[in-house]
């Protein structure tokens, strides 16, 4: 019961903090980001009022266009609402608009804008472009868009000029990557002296949250980047730097240069206040708005004790992924025109006028309304900004693919990062793959929105995936080549593989939202070296009737596909004749594999789940497949510990480690029943799987807990009269602080919550705290400050964070969990070193 009360108390504090008025940062000391689809409003100011049509609403500030003026007062009609100043637009006839046929690629901004006007005018409605490409990712995300006056709006003519942009063979498994093999004090060899990121294709690096070159380990964790020197006898945390305003999720390493790929807090308040110290945000986001922003942070590692941020590149858009090909990072982003000032009718009576107005919005739009922008900040504090891509570097597929912009930014990792070189396609992007001199980006094919059930069923039957191809042979630029389409949906990056001039794509027919009795999986072969659109040359199907794909791997002329619903058919596919691919073998076993890792030419390791004959999963299972005879694949051995555990290697291949010199496979493992969190080492030899041992991050009995400095002055709970309650609820490790109202306190390894006074009093009274004690608490909290409590993340549970990654460096197996880097000897797995981050 005491534990339950402690848990309830913790969540009650959290609810109190979250439920308080966040419009005033002094109320709780925290700042909550609004939902990105919410519409911030402002107070009407100025002498002019506005006219709003019945059934429509106008919200937010707008901008007066050059050469226009507002004459006379206007009136708000009954039943409508108006917030914010408005703009009157010049009156032009719709018949003046002349649209011309689209060009691929665009040669000028006028061509690009004409194409966008043509496609958008055909699809815009009373609710803007909402739904126009939503199924394929091409729709508009309304995020605090500005509204404009409706009554005086009709179409505008095309402007005489448009603002220009300002932006500058054999698939092989590898546990090392090109970007990690250089940069230490000695020339260590990846795959021999240390392991790198588990990548899909040899020589093509992939971003990850941890990187090493054998001499150092870099870890990006929340807003922090950590540098650990592992070149000596004892590992040393030499420096940690805060990535202020960014949440670094992945990074790429090349010598002494590190590229962190981060999300950025893209919110600007109505008063122009920015939620972070990132100066680029205020240049990209209008007051009262939110945008999805991605930042590339270049870090100089030459002085391990003094890491320096050299250059940052902040761009509008969502980060998809990145690859390093031919010495350059190819960073894939997708963005949409988020702030076109559409109106939305409050009822059906206003739909016709709203549609007319929204067509006008399309007609008056400029290139900057559609394409993403960027801000580059150099180490000396100078800024460069503009459109991320020039108009003549934008293309569109021959089939309309929505209004999103899929951009590939090329970054030379051997030189300081400058203004971006970008190529873009008017399409969305979800899954990327690189191989054979090309980068591929796959996404759901665009379809117009549907309303009735029969249309949904038809859409499911015709579900398709679009694939966009880019040439990456030039280290200084990425070039769009063409696009193609395959039926069904892909699982992940392993669904694609280029080999000998052909792209092989594995898909399950229908949409990704469940099982269909008539569904099946197919492998489609596309010609990849034509220099034009991807064209189908062969296909094989009828795999996994009523099932869907759970794992795919291509190795040379062979493909492996796992489907699952109740059992696990493991298929072998002969792709030696691209025009006539053939399913050669099928092995049915219980459970499934979620990740396939080729060991050599004849063995494949599958990491997944054991299951009953009815398909109910039972816990982690590792299977060793013999594929020496494609007509008769067999399962040589399995490892299944039971207990309902799982491994993140099932869905994130970077969590898997294969160390060939010792025939050792290492994977994270969590057993939710027992609470175990470990890394399991398995020896794969002589057709068997043998567990060597397990590594965990439980503190040793003689291990000192890392000291964490509280961010605010601490206060003795005894002074608050909370000591008895604290001990009774086993909260003896809690930290109480008095923090300024405008701060958001954080402590490594702790959950910190501001205690809003009224809610706190309600909870305290319910726990029996006397009014005298509550009065004492009130007197001890000075004006302008707030009471904050920080509870250890592992309190009450003896919980340890799951191990996320493992590395081999020299004679040690290194493992990483949140806040901790640990070394265990490869021989015996005894713990040899611990670094608390």
Regions found by a protein language model. Give the residues of each.
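Conserved hydrophobic/aromatic packing and binding residues within compact polymer-binding modules
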Residues: 774
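C-terminal motif of bacterial Sec signal peptides marking the signal peptidase cleavage site
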Residues: 14-17
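Short acidic beta-strand-loop surface patches of small beta-rich interaction domains
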Residues: 777-782
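Sec-dependent signal peptide recognition
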Residues: 2-8
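Beta-sheet-rich non-transmembrane sensory/scaffold domains
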Residues: 19-41, 46-49, 54-62, 66-752, ...
